[in-house]
Structures are given as structure tokens and as C-alpha cells.
Amino acid sequence: VSEPLGNRPSPEQLLVLHAALDPAPAAAGAWRNWRQAVDFDAVDHGSTRLLPLVYRNLGPDAFDPEVAGRLKGLYRRSWSHNQLIFKRAADAIAVLEAAGIETLVTKGASLAILSYGDVGVRPMDDVDVLVPIERTAAAIEALSAAGWSPDHDDPLAWTQVHHSLGFAGADAGNIDLHWFSLWQPASDDELWRASVPLELGGVASRAPCPADQLLLACVHGTPWSPLPPFRWIADAVTVIRSAGEQLDWDRLVAEAERRRLTVAAAAALGYLHDEFGAAVPRPVLSRLRAAPASRHERAAFRAAGRPDSPLRTLRMAWDRYRRLCDLDTGAPRPAGFVDFARRFWGLESAWRLPLHAVRALSRRRARGDARSAP
């Protein structure tokens, strides 16, 4: 039984997606409808991040001069910002390489280079860099010694319950250091084995192969977030189109099964096929929908697609805890779920968990309101 995609774009966001992804006649119609429905000066942040792609898809002649100028400015700003953060990320990758640590660039940066083929159309805030899990401590030490500042006071403790940690450079640019490629922890050995070469800012690294890139985009983008995450749709459609026949669908199904993510993959790919005509083979959808999935996996997927609540927060934390318990990472493990939750939220006492959950929910909703404001 397939699960519906819970976190979908609004009608207005769907229009800007079609303007960014559809062939010219349909894209132009979607753009006109979007302009009639949305005040350009009050565009939500998620839609704003797609406007450089709309500009490239339709071309400057499709807009009146004022709008064309604004869109061109957004594209140039994205291109310039990405060049800067790519250079800083390349510095970090060079530090890791000098320490003998392999790197694999995931998400936005690798998508911009290998799938979009244009670093200006895919805005991003940082660069995601995956290292082998057994080299996590060495990577943190090397980056810290080179002047990169971790976002947490005790980064080694952080690694035991999380999947990534932000680092800020001395100048501009941030990286998100990953030891797991996804929130849902699983072995990334296959990801490394099938990875492809990538050059970022003049430095050699690796990137996920198209099948893995597509699976990561679908799984990472579908959960609810205060900042609308529907950019995953553009990422996934672009990977499918750019990879063409090189996309190994059998691999995608196998990896979704191994990672216990067939429910999320089926929902996301089914939506892309139905709404955007993405070339997802029907047998692939059938295999994903027919794959065995536990009640826990389905419940975690449903919870992830809903707005924040204490129950959702606990369900997702429980999902991460169960998955971590199934892995042999060699790192110390929490004594139980309560200990995991306490360490996950950095609390001194388990008695503070209920209060923290309510406060965290309030803060996250406030951030979402602030980002949505014009």
C-alpha cells in the first residue's frame, strides 16, 4: 500500500515550480498565473530560491524589463554567493585531503555542478561534505586546527546522536560536515563505492552517482520544514532529466530497500511522475510500493510530512534512535531512548525533556514565521 506525499507545495508554489521546470509554452503560462496570484514583493523564501531557475528556463525575453532585471539580479547574486562558498568549501576539502580524509560532496553543490550545469540557478547556504564515518573525529580535529569553528561546544559528543555538524570559516562560507548522508542513519559504504568524480573550486572530491543523488533528494526534501523544502522537486526532476538513460533505477530501488526508505521514495517519485511527468518507470514505482515496509517506517514517514508538534518530534527522534541501534558504528551508544533524547537536545537531565520539546517547537515555528514574512 503506497503512502501519499504529505508535505506538498501550495498552489502558488506549484506554479513557480512549473515555471521553472516545464517546457517553454507551459512554463510561460504557469509564470503568468503565478504573477497574477502572488505579490512579487511578498514572495515566500522557498519560491524566491527557485526564481533563478525560472529565469534560465524562460530566458530574459519572457519578462518585462523590470522583472527581468530583478530576476537577473537574483541569478547573479546566487552565482556570486555560490562561487564564494565553493571556494571556502574547497579550502576545507583541501584541509581534509591533507589529513588523508576522503570527501564526498552531497546535495546542492554537487547538484549545481553535475545536474544543473549552472551554479547560479541553485541557491544554497552552505556546502555539504560527507566523510567516512570512521574518520569523523579526525575530520573535526583537522578542520578545527585549520580555523574552522564547529557549531557545537562538544562536537565529538554531538556526533554520537546526530548526522552532521556545521562549521564556519574564518572568512565567509560554511560547510555542513556529514558522517551520515541522511537524517535516517545507515551505512554509506555503497554511496562511496558508486560515487563519481567532482571538482569543486579547483579541488578534487567525489559526488553521489545519479541514482543515489535522486534518492537523497527525495528523502531529504520531503519532510516538513519551516522553510518550505519543495526545492527538492526541482532537484529530483533535474537529476532525472540530466542523467537520462545513465540513471540506474535498479540501484535506486535496491538502496531504498537497504536503507528502509521505500515508503518515502515511492511517495516522492510517484508525485514527480504524476505532477511533473518525470520519466520514472512504472515498474520502479510498482517495486517500491510493493516492497515490505514496517509499520514503524510508515509511521515515521507520515510524521515527517506533518507540521511540528511534540508527537512528531518524538516520532522522528525515535526513528533515528532505532536506526542507530541497528548500526555497528564503533561509537559509544546511548543507554536507551531517554538517554538518546537527552543527548540529542543537549539537556543535563531527562526531566527537562517535555519542557524542551515545547520550547523547541515554539522557536522553530517563530523562525518559520520570520522566514515567511515579506
Go through each PLM region and give its residues.
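Conserved NTP-donor binding/palm subdomain of two-metal-ion nucleotidyltransferases/polymerases, i.e.
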Residues: S2-D125, V131-P374
